[in-house]
Structure formats: C-alpha cells, structure tokens
C-alpha cells in the first residue's frame, strides 16, 4: 500500500511531464490501478478525441432524422426511407465511438481443431513461465486450473487475456461481458437459419404472422416497459438484412411486419415479446422456450453489459462456464446455481448452464506481461468456427428437443464472431489453418467480412495500409511425414497452399490472389508446436526438449523445394525466414510471428481503422442529404452533380459488361407481391379505423372547390371577408394514401438495396455510385410527381363499377406499372422523341424503338443487332440527364431558408469528417 501511495504521489508531482507520468503509472502495483475500459480515468487523448468525433457524427444522424421529420414537404415519400438510413448510420457511429474507447485487440480465429491452443498459450505467457491469471488477490494457472482438458474444441465464449486490471466485486473476482436480449434472439435465429436446410423451410403463412402481430397489438402497453427500444429492434432487423437477406423465414416477414415488430416489442412483456421473436425461427416451441429462459435470466440482472461471479463459476474446471459442455445441461436440470452480481447492485443466482449460455466473454488478467505490446493490446481467443448442419426444417421441433445443446452452441459460436466484428473489436487477426482439407465452409466469408471492414473491399482500398491479417499455417511438422505415393518435390508445397488458400480462402474471394493492385496476399507464417512430440522428425533430451533433426538431409531437400515453389514465393513475404522460424527448435515460429505482430499492435492502427470507417460513414450521410440542399451556386452544383452522374454512368456500363444490368434494374424496381401485401395491410387498417376513407373512387374534391361552388350562389351579395385559405393537407382519399405508401415502400426497398454489403461486388459498382443512383432516382420521382401520377390514374381507373377482385387488384397493378416504368425509362418515354437526350456518336434519341418494316417482315442481318447494348447506353445517358434536371428543378424550387440553413450546417459538419 505504501508503495502505491508513493507512486501516486510521484504521478501527481510530474503531471506535466508525459514520460515521467508513464514511469509513475508503471510503478503503481497493478491491483491499485483503475480498470481502463470501465473507469477511463486516464484515457488516451487521441482515442477519446476520435470517440468524440464519432459521437458528433451520431448526433448529426439524429439531427438529420429531426430535420427529415420537419421537412416533410421536401423529402416527401422518401422521408421514412431516409429516417431509417440515418437511424442505421447513427447506430454505426455509436458503435465506432465505443470501439475507439476500447483497447485494441489481436484475435486468434479459425475453424475448430486447427492448432490454435498452442498459439494462444504461447502469446499469453512470458517465456519460460506458465500462464498465470490473477483473480483479485488470488492466482490461478490457466492450463492447470481453468482451461478445460481434452483435445476437443472446448470453449463457447470469447476469452480475453489482458494485462489491464480486471476488477470484480468483493468475493466475485470473475468478470464477464454478457449477451443482450437481442443477442439471444440473433443466436436462436442463427441456429435455425444456418442449421436447417433452407430448401426444407416452409415460411410461416401471412395469416399466422398477422395473427401474431394482432395478438401483440392487443397486449402492447402505450409506452416502452423496459430497457429495450426501437433502435435495438432496428439493429436486429439490420442483422437479418446483412446475414440472412434471402432466407425464407426473413422474407416471410415483409418490411411492414418488421416495422410493427420494431414498434411493438419494446411495449410488450418479456414473455410476449419472446413469443413474437419466435417468428424468426418459425415458432419452434423448444427454441422459443429456451430463448425465454435466457432472456428472463438476463432480466433478473437488469440486462447488464458486465457481471461478476465468484470463483465457483470457473472451478472446478470440469464444470467451468468456460467449458462449452457445461451448456449441455440446458433443459436437463440446468445445473447448480451460481451467484451473479452487477456493479449497479443487482444480484441473482443463475443455473450454471444458463449462465454459460448468456456469457459472451470471460476477462482474464495476466499476472506476467508476455510481450511489450500487451501494454495496449488485449488477446482474444475465439471459439473455433464450426461446420453447420442441414437438418430437415419439417422436423425442427424434434431436432430442437434432441439436439438443443449443439444448435445453441453452433449458433452462439457463429454469432459471437459477428458481434465482435460489428463492434470493431478485431483490430488484428491471426487466422489458423491446418494441413488437412477444410470443412467449415463459412470461414472464408467470415474472414472476407472482416477484411472489408478493416482494410477495404478492393485492392485499391487496401493499398498503403498495414496488413493486420496473419495467415498462420499450423502443424508445420506434419508436412514432413512420408506419405505413400507423395514425393518430396516442389509441388508438395503447392498442395498445402491449395487446401488452405486457393480452394478455401480464395474460393469465391479475390483477396488472396490480389491483396493490393498486382500483388497477392503474402503475410503467411508457419507454426509448429514443440510441445507435441514428433520423434520421426526430431530428437529430444531427457526433459522432452528438442535438440536436433533426425534427418537433416531430407529437411534441407524439402526446404530447397519450398523456396523454389512459385506459389510459395507469391504468398510468403520472406519464404526463407518463414521456414527457419517454423523449424526453430523449441520455438516453432512463435518468435518470428510475435516480432511481425508487434508493429501492428499499435493503437494508431485501430484509430486509422475507425477513422477510415467514420470518414466513409460521414461521406455516405452527406451524400444522402446533399440532394435536398439548395446551393447558392447553381452552376457549381450542376457541374458537381454532372461529374458524379458520369462516373455512375461509366460504372453502369461496367455492370452491363458483367451481364448484371438486368438484375440491377430488377433490384431497383418494386415487386407486385410487396405492393399487394402493402395494400392488404392498408385495407385491414382502414377497416379497423371507422373514420378512415376507404373508397378509391372518383376524383379528390377539395374544400376550396366546394367553397367556390357555394359562394357562387351569392355573387350579387357584398363580398365577404376572404377566409383564410387552408393549406392543402396530405393524402385525402384512398388513392392518395396508397400512392404515397407504394412510393414510400419502393424508396425504402431501393435504400435497403444501396445499404446491402453484397451490392458492390454483384453489380461492379462501388457503394458511393449505388448511393448516388438511388438518391437521384428518388429525386427524379419527386420532381416528376410519381406519387401524384399514381393517385390520379387510380382515381381515373376506379371511376366506374367493377368486380371486387378487380378493385383490389387494380391499384396494385397501377402502382407497380408506374414505378417500374419510371425505373426503366425515367420519364423520358413520355417526352417527344426529338426532345429526348441524344446518345451515341450518331446522336440518336434515347429509348426509340426501331421502325417496323412496312410489310411486317423483319430484316435479319448476318450478325445480331445489339439492342441490349443500345439500351444500356440509353439508360446511362438518361440517368445523366435525370441528374441534371434534378439540379435545375431544385434550383427553381421554393426554399424554406431556415430549414435549408439547418441542413447546410449538418452537411458542413459531415463534410469535415468525410475528408
């Protein structure tokens, strides 16, 4: 204690001397230092500055939502889609702020049983000493007392090794990060959607979904009843949009149903909202009951982010919460109770199996610092990725009853990676792959998602960045086995790289072959475990330490072939050094790997990653708002937009070259089924609201017209005082209501398309180009009054009697045709041919059909005429003109100067971050 007081006094005395401060802090015993990620008493100034910048962008997103709500006459039908966009971006900015405040991490990841254990053990211990963990005043050996025994994959949570103090509560030194309610939902849904063959999934009928929603409506309170809010539910929706976009269960929940779930769930009791969540796993009873049990356990603690337990939670290690097998008791007694407490004072006793299921991370404080980079870096050990099953979904309840543990285990392991990826926790990754064929086919996509988020989705984006991905080829000594029929030649090494890189990581992904322009990925390392005896390769002393190779001649031959292999030269930055490191006695490659790891274990790397993503985020946000801001310099705005439009046009032609243009148009159009469901829900809502206007018949009549007719009776009388004219309000009849809803639904769909992660790769267009495309189509729809045109046509078409079936079908057909025609022709089909934009060197008018032969007999040439190519060019030219007309139209519009100034202020703030 005295030493601590002296050290703190020294710290105060040298507060103005940074280096002296560091020395003084280092002199304070670890157990007296505050926990960095909780108390934040000595935050890194740069990290905190970046976090505040992220917070400012999140605040700007909220400001944009408020502006959208006030500017309904400007954003019109696009308002709901824009508001959802900015809600998503605001959540993303908050996650980046949290990431900036947390320490950087090196993650060890890979499929199950890939030799990760030796790598973790070696990185987490000081040379020559066992890994020792501090729990308050007690010490435990990690391998001796905590880590489960056996050669099987054993963990079902993330293990964090840190040298920062991990301070629990009195008598409860075991500190855990907990799952949230929506985490539980994601895990259950992941288990169902990944482990049941989607071809056997029969989606829930719309009547079943509607019945569940109606039941929830009847039980919903007027306001939220707990911590859950609509942002949590929106984040849940975004999870399914990202990972299960085309799964039948997700598709069955049309956007309208999802929006109701977002609104209803926070206002329901736990039991009622978990029942509503059951729609995400096809109402499988056992899965719903298990989800309810886990959510209720979290509710006892008031849904904490962190909780503390006594040593009982990890001892004895055969029953520890770190051992995933402990979770196998779920539904089978659930195990003995374990006390759990939160820093807010909540306490509960949770069954051991339940506690194991709801813990996301176990935090372990290392007694000894293994490497100097642990001063600012934590080591994360992820449970091994597992292959997924293909159960018959028709037997979902039967499978859930008999195999609940494995379902939950696979779902949780997969989701934990996704959660930490979303939270930007994985600054660097050590990807471990062994020599045999890889069976966990989901790993390449998981790695690719991380690369896209941390380094960039293209070789150009990754250029100039520190490489934070380390490909670790484990079990190097297995390469020296003499295999029947296999020769010790150069091709031997291509076979190894084939199983890990070419036919696994590179299958469907181009980053291994081109990490940066013109250069393949080459941050590859060998790793060998000296603790596993290989007497066919090495000789050992009496203590089991390696002393020499048994056949140096063969080792030299294999090394020569390795160095001569062209694939090796591509994928190893320094093949000879990698070989020598892997063959180093009693080391196996750890020394070389840690040496290369040290430079990227730098807080500046994480800041660059977060700053890069924040800049992209701010740029996207500004891009979505710019179309609504009226610039004082119309010529400059026109030049800027014209340049953007031409860039999009070129990418549209690249999309056409990839034969994806037709699919792009389809994504930009609206589906008739979607509008039919929308119309059905609108009719149901109208039926439940006695005052609702339900008849889309005739034309809309305004109060102004009625007053005009009435006053005409009294033209000879003195003119009365002119009444104050009321502003025309929003939709007045069913035609207006449905037209507005249909256009809003279409706009939300194309905004969702622009936000999808797979869109750039599928359509050969970058994210900014797709966002511009969507924004300008929306602006064109407003300018050309697409909603009003649909409503007018509905009134015209419905102005005569017809069957009930046609009355229900026709509005959908009208809206679908109008929206999809707009996407196809952008309004230029209604323009006289001579007034249309010109395309091609010959200056032909766009979208002109070739003249029909006089005798109705087509003239066929020897080579087919490329009508599709002409259409692609016409569409790109039409888009450029659409953008120009949008700018000119905005320039002549009436402007609310106060609203426009507020929008300009938001844009200025975002542009500063986007630089």
Model-derived regions, located:
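Non-catalytic alpha-helical scaffolds
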Residues: 1-159, 163-431, 435-468, 478-915
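Active-site neighborhood of phospho(di)ester-bond hydrolases with catalytic His/Asp-centered motifs
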Residues: 472
């Amino acid at each position: 204690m005295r030493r601590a007081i002296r050290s703190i006094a020294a710290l105060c005395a040298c507060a103005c001397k940074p280096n002296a401060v560091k020395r003084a802090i280092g002199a304070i015993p670890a157990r007296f230092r505050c926990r960095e990620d909780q108390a934040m008493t000595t935050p890194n100034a740069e990290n905190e500055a970046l976090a505040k910048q992220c917070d400012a962008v999140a605040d700007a997103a909220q400001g944009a939502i408020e502006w959208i709500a006030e500017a309904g006459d400007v954003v019109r039908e696009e308002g709901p889609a824009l508001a959802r966009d900015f809600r998503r971006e605001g959540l993303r900015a908050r996650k980046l702020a949290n990431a900036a405040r947390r320490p950087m991490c090196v993650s060890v990841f890979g499929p199950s049983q890939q030799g990760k254990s030796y790598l973790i053990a070696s990185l987490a211990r000081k040379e020559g000493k066992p890994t020792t963990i501090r729990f308050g005043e007690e010490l435990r050996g990690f391998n001796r007392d905590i880590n489960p025994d056996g050669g099987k994959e054993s963990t079902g949570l993330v293990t964090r090794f840190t040298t920062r103090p991990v301070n629990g509560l009195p008598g409860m030194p075991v500190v855990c990060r907990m799952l949230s309610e929506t985490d539980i939902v994601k895990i259950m849904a992941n288990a169902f959607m990944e482990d049941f063959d989607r071809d056997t999934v029969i989606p829930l009928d719309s009547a079943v979904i509607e019945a569940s929603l109606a039941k929830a409506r009847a039980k919903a309170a007027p306001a939220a009843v707990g911590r859950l809010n609509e942002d949590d539910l929106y984040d849940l929706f975004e999870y399914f949009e990202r990972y299960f976009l085309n799964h039948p269960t997700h598709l069955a929940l049309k956007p309208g149903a999802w929006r109701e779930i977002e609104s209803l769930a926070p206002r329901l009791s736990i039991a009622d909202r978990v029942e509503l969540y059951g729609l995400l796993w096809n109402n499988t009873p056992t899965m719903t009951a298990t989800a309810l049990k886990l959510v209720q356990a979290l509710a006892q603690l008031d849904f904490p982010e962190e909780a503390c337990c006594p040593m009982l939670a990890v001892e004895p290690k055969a029953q520890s919460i770190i051992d995933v097998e402990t979770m196998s008791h779920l539904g089978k007694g659930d195990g003995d109770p374990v006390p759990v407490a939160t820093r807010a004072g909540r306490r509960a006793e949770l069954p051991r199996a339940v506690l194991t299921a709801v813990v996301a991370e176990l935090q372990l404080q290392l007694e000894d610092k293994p490497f100097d980079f642990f001063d600012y870096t934590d080591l994360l050990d992820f449970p091994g990725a597992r292959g997924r099953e293909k159960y018959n979904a028709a037997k979902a309840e039967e499978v859930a009853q008999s195999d609940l543990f494995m379902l939950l285990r696979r779902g949780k392991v997969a989701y934990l990676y996704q959660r930490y990826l979303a939270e930007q926790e994985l600054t660097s990754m050590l990807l471990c792959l062994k020599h045999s064929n890889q069976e966990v086919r989901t790993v390449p996509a998981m790695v690719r998602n991380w690369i896209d988020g941390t380094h960039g989705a293209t070789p150009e984006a990754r250029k100039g960045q520190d490489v934070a991905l380390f490909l670790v080829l484990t079990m190097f000594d297995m390469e020296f086995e003499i295999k029947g029929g296999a020769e010790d030649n150069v091709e031997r090494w291509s076979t190894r790289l084939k199983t890990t890189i070419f036919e696994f990581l590179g299958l469907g992904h181009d980053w291994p072959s081109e990490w940066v322009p013109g250069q393949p990925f080459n941050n590859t390392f060998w790793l060998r475990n000296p603790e596993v005896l290989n007497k066919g390769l090495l000789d050992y002393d009496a203590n089991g330490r390696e002393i020499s190779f048994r056949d140096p001649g063969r080792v030299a031959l294999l090394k020569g072939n390795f160095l001569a292999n062209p694939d090796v030269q591509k994928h190893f930055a320094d093949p000879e050094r990698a070989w020598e490191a892997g063959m180093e006695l009693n080391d196996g490659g750890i020394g070389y790997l840690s040496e290369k790891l040290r430079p990227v274990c730098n807080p500046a790397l994480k800041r660059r990653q977060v700053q890069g993503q924040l800049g992209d985020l701010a740029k996207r946000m500004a891009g979505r708002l710019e179309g609504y801001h009226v610039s004082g310099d119309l010529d400059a705005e026109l030049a800027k937009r014209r340049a953007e439009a031409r860039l999009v046009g070129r990418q549209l032609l690249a999309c056409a070259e990839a034969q994806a243009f037709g699919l792009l148009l389809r994504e930009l159009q609206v589906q008739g089924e979607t509008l039919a469901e929308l119309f059905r829900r609108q009719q149901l809502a109208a039926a439940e609201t006695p005052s609702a206007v339900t008849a889309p018949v005739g034309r809309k009549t305004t109060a102004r017209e009625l007053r005009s007719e009435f006053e005409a009776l009294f033209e000879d009388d003195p003119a009365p005082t002119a009444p104050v004219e009321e502003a025309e309000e929003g939709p007045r009849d069913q035609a207006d209501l449905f037209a507005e809803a249909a256009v809003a639904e279409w706009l939300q769909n194309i905004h969702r398309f622009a936000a999808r992660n797979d869109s750039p790769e599928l359509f050969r267009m970058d994210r900014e180009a797709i966002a511009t495309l969507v924004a300008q189509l929306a602006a064109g729809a407003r300018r050309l009054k697409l909603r009003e045109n649909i409503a007018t046509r509905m009134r015209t078409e419905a102005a005569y009697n017809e069957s009930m079936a046609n009355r229900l079908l026709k509005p959908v057909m009208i809206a679908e045709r109008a929206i999809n025609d707009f996407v196809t022709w952008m309004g230029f089909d209604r323009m006289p041919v001579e007034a249309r934009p010109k395309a091609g060197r010959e200056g032909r008018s766009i979208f002109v059909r070739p003249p029909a032969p006089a005798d109705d007999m087509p003239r066929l040439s020897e080579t087919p005429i490329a009508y599709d190519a002409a259409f692609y060019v016409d569409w790109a030219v039409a888009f450029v003109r659409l953008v120009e007309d949008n700018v000119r139209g905005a320039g002549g519009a009436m402007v609310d100067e106060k609203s426009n100034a507020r929008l300009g202020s938001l844009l200025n703030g975002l542009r500063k971050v986007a630089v």
